[in-house]
Amino acid sequence: MSLPDGFYIRRMEEGDLEQVTETLKVLTTVGTITPESFSKLIKYWNEATVWNDNEDKKIMQYNPMVIVDKRTETVAATGNIIIERKIIHELGLCGHIEDIAVNSKYQGQGLGKLLIDQLVTIGFDYGCYKIILDCDEKNVKFYEKCGFSNAGVEMQIRK
């Protein structure tokens, strides 16, 4: 499945702050983020790598992606896959999909599934043995359509 006409996908950039935070508000509270802090975050994400046996292939630890409307240069969707090097599975890689959000103006166009597909491709291309995510009960059917299956229970503790 490819992106609909008029959209493209790319890595998140420093100039995306306002649109990304606005898009993430459909998911949860975002709070106040200064342009300076966002710039530092993007720089960190662009430099952080995961140790790799195959030095020919750089494994980016953070892979924040956005789907953009070409007509307006508006961020329509955002998400991230974070790559973790584990001890188990012979020092295997595990991908964690995080912060999937589609701008309310663009929902219902299949962009969320396309974004998930792209993030899964990134994870498997890096060699992840599995890709996991946490979601609200109301989103289970969506993630099942994306090929995910229930594999346990999420637990949390908050301060």
Swiss-Prot record:
Disulfide partners: none
Superkingdom: Eukaryota
Record-level Gene Ontology MF annotations: glucosamine 6-phosphate N-acetyltransferase activity
E.C. designation(s): 2.3.1.4
Keyword Transcription tagged: no
GO CC annotations on file: cytoplasm; nucleus
Signal peptide: none
Keywords (A to Z) from UniProt: Acetylation, Acyltransferase, Transferase
Domain spans labelled N-acetyltransferase: 28-159
One Pfam family per UniProt: Acetyltransf_1
Top-level EC class: transferase
Binding-site residues for D-glucosamine 6-phosphate, renumbered to this chain: T28, K86, I87, I88, H89, E98, D99, I100, Y129, K130, D134, R158
Residues that bear N-acetylserine: S2
Catalytic activity: D-glucosamine 6-phosphate + acetyl-CoA = N-acetyl-D-glucosamine 6-phosphate + CoA + H(+)
A biological-process GO annotation: UDP-N-acetylglucosamine biosynthetic process
Pathway: Nucleotide-sugar biosynthesis; UDP-N-acetyl-alpha-D-glucosamine biosynthesis; N-acetyl-alpha-D-glucosamine 1-phosphate from alpha-D-glucosamine 6-phosphate (route I): step 1/2
UniProt keyword Ion transport present: no
Residues binding acetyl-CoA: I100, A101, V102, G108, Q109, G110, L111, G112, K113, Y143, E144, K145
Note: Present with 2550 molecules/cell in log phase SD medium.
Protein family per UniProt: Belongs to the acetyltransferase family. GNA1 subfamily.
UniProt subunit comment: Homodimer.
Protein name: Glucosamine 6-phosphate N-acetyltransferase
